[in-house]
Structures are given as C-alpha cells and as structure tokens.
C-alpha cells in the first residue's frame, strides 16, 4: 500500500514557468558558485535565505513559519519547499524541487538529506541559519563540518550582470511612475493610505505591463505627512493631509525580488 503520509515527495505539476532571467543567466551563476565550491573542497551548499535561493534558482519563497532551502551540488540545483505550496516552487525553480510534508517534525531536514547524501562538508549561510537550525542540521545530516559561505556568495552577487542591470533600471522607471501617481493624489484632506495606494496601484500596473510572466508582490509605498515624517520607517496611517504639512514619499517596486526606490 502506498504511503499516504510521506516525509517528502516530488510533484512536477504543470509546465515550468518563465523565470525572471534566462536559463544561461542562472547557469552562469551556478557555474561561478560551483567554482568557489571546488576551490574550497566543498561538495554541497545549502541556501536558506530568500535572496540566495532566488538568486540561484529563481524561486522566491513565502515561508509562513516553515523553512525553505536550495541544495546545490556539482551536478544539481534543488529547491526544498513546503507541501502547502504544492507545485509552484517546482514551476518557478531553475532545476529540481523536493517537497517536505508536515506529518513529522523535521521533515524539512529529511528532504534536504534525500538530496545531499553524506557530503562530509556543507556550506551554509552563517548570517541566516539560526543556532537551533544549525544544531538540527548537524544531528540529522551527520555532517562534521559546516562552513559559512555567506561572505563569498555575497561577493559573487555584488557583480551585477547586464540582465540584472536591465531589470533594476526598469525598476527605477516604475518607481518614477509611482512617484508621479503619489504627487497627483496629494490634496488637503486625503489620507496617507489613499495617497500610498495610488502610487502602489500605478506601479503594480506598470510592472504587470512590462513583466507579464512575473509574480506580483511586495511592491509598496511609504507616504508620511506632518508629525509622521519624523522617522524614515514610520508606517502609513490614516492621517489626513493638512495645509502646510511636510510630506515624505518613497516608492518601492520590487520586481522579482529586486529592490529599487524613489
């Protein structure tokens, strides 16, 4: 009888989606990473942060209290995702995907182990993996050496490709659209939230037009007035604008996880 409560499984549901970048972009990133791994005699790397998983696989996760990962070896790139997301992580990943279930505690690590095997040495993100996760990693994977590769990987990410620069440049264009919409919405009596929504909606429409294959999330506007301008990160409120108010605006189009701001 088939196991109806597996620890992990694969689900290739639908067709692969169009990712933020072309296949050769991801292949180049992985090639540079694998060269670094080879130089450090490191058979495998486990990424856990949103930025590195997205950078190397194209998949931008939404954790909702669950861990996510991306295991890179010399011949595979595999995202590790929660059952609640079903086939979306596979569709949005450059490479393979393994899904872990919630039936038993630490099934995430069992899924990771199914891809890793026994590498002996594993690269991790020391600036992201918690101490508790590191202990569980050692116990469940039986890995003697965990090496922090976060600084090396950050150095690799800092050198932007032409494709990345094009995406960031378009983000700046979209930020300007949001700023113009905010300006048009400013009037005495308007609430901060009303003005912010005008800018956000304008940017999301612009992103959808320019990037029809993207996922749309995380684009927002900070718009503060009067006393609320005293802190850069004060949340948007329902305060109504008054004549003579100081105003502060920031528009943030996040296209496929790439940050730009006006």
Predicted regions and their residues:
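Short alpha-helical functional segments enriched in proximate histidine and acidic residues
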Residues: 36, 185, 202-206
């Amino acid at each position: 009888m088939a196991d109806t409560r597996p620890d992990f499984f694969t689900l290739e549901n639908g067709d692969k989606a169009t990712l933020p970048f072309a296949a050769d972009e991801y292949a180049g990133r992985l090639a540079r990473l694998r060269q670094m791994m080879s130089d450090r005699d490191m058979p495998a790397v486990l990424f856990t942060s949103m930025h590195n998983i997205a950078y190397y696989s194209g998949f931008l996760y939404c954790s909702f209290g669950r861990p996510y990962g991306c295991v890179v070896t010399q011949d595979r790139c595999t995202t590790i995702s929660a059952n609640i997301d079903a086939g979306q992580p596979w569709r949005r990943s450059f490479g393979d995907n393994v899904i872990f279930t919630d039936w038993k505690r630490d099934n995430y690590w069992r899924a990771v182990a199914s891809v890793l095997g026994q590498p002996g040495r594993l690269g991790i993100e020391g600036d992201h993996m918690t101490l508790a996760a590191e202990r569980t990693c050692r116990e469940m994977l039986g890995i003697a050496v965990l090496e922090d590769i976060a600084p090396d990987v950050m150095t690799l990410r800092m050198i932007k490709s032409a494709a990345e620069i094009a995406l960031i440049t378009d983000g700046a264009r979209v930020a300007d659209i949001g700023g113009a919409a905010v300006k048009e919405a400013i009037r005495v009596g308007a609430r901060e939230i009303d003005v912010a929504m005008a800018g956000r909606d304008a940017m999301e429409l612009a992103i959808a037009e320019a990037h029809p294959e993207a996922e749309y999330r995380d684009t927002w506007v900070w718009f503060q007035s009067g006393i609320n301008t005293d802190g850069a990160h004060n949340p948007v409120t329902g305060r109504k604008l008054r004549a003579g108010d100081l105003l502060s605006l920031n528009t943030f189009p996040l296209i496929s996880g790439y940050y730009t701001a006006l």
